[in-house]
Amino acid sequence: EPLALGDPDKRVRRVAWCSGGAQGFFHEAAGLDIDCFLTGEASEFVTHLAAETGIGFLAAGHHATERYGIAALGAHLAEKFGIAHEHIDLPNPV
């Protein structure tokens, strides 16, 4: 189940996004004048940092945030190098 933290009425202009388990980059991204940080996983310390900084935090699931990017990369490499490519998406609840 996705996790959304922050003020739902706050206007979001700048988003930092890193797929998978990148919640550890929240502190670094917070220094980039962002309004929201989107990643796959949450950690307890990040929920506190989000509240302290006023930056929205979205954890949409590790698998969910990586599945389309890796499929696009495979298709790109197949086209660029003329190789066969098949993306196999194995559902993962994490």
List where the protein language model places each region.
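Hydrophobic structural segments
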Residues: 1-94
